[in-house]
Amino acid sequence: MPWIQLKINTSGNVAEQLGDAMIESGAVSVTFQDTHDTPVFEPLPGETRLWGDTDAIALYDAETDMNDVIAMLEQEPLLGVGFKHKIEQLEDKDWEREWMDNFHPMQFGKRLWICPSWRDIPDPTAVNVMLDPGLAFGTGTHPTTALCLQWLDGLDLEGKTIIDFGCGSGILAIAALKLGAARAIGIDIDPQAIQASRDNAQRNGVSERLELYLPKDQPADLSADVVVANILAGPLRELAPLISDLPKAGGHLGLSGVLATQADGVAEAYADKFTLDPVAEREEWCRITGQRRAS
């Protein structure tokens, strides 16, 4: 059915309060987006951050009297009488179908494809990972995930062990297994990521070769031929002593989730143990790779 959309510009520090008021006025959902499309990359630990200039967007049933809604919201001290707003009629669509139509098989490197389950596989002879887009974890569409997948495709993984540090959906570990790795270990702080990785590994027929751990449960003596960590620059710097010890001597390390402007700081944290390659960039993001030197 059609909907009515109400958009109100506000500041991040009162956005949630405004959202509550919109729900009380009859909205069936409220979302927030940055007015200027400025990304928030690294909130501080424990911080749920909204932008300084935020749009609160509410959806109402098509039968809603928006004059009544506006009159009710004008009673809110943070808005007041005559507050600026925008009302739009949204046409009825098959939103699920429209969402699905946006995702297509994607190729990374020479051999590797990531394919949504509802699409035909473009090349049955290629290395195909079946992975459906989700809300929280990597699917290959983000530049950092793409950089890591391309790197894995270019390695000789046959018979190797890989650690995916911050595994999310498990996409990198699963891709490595499909590319020939004998064993993969996924580590993530989020139990939902562990479950998502487990489900995706089962779908791709590699669950018997994938071990998954929360950090508190991981074995103390972990090591691997290849280690990939697609997280963020801050954790990569802070966890450098831990991550640096995971690759075996001569093993490969791949780091991403790093803005190009942050590359030097992250690389410096790993330079004492690794011979680093030139930084690879995609859009505003980069990938740092290297090989561990013998102790």
Swiss-Prot record:
Primary enzyme class: transferase
Primary location: cytoplasm
Source organism of this protein record: Pectobacterium carotovorum subsp. carotovorum (strain PC1)
Catalytic activity, reaction form: L-lysyl-[protein] + 3 S-adenosyl-L-methionine = N(6),N(6),N(6)-trimethyl-L-lysyl-[protein] + 3 S-adenosyl-L-homocysteine + 3 H(+)
EC numbers for this chain: 2.1.1.-
Protein name: Ribosomal protein L11 methyltransferase
Keywords (A to Z) from UniProt: Cytoplasm, Methyltransferase, S-adenosyl-L-methionine, Transferase
Record has Aminoacyl-tRNA synthetase as a keyword: no
Matches recorded under InterPro entries: Ribosomal_L11_MeTrfase_PrmA (IPR050078), Ribosomal_PrmA_MeTrfase (IPR004498), SAM-dependent_MTases_sf (IPR029063)
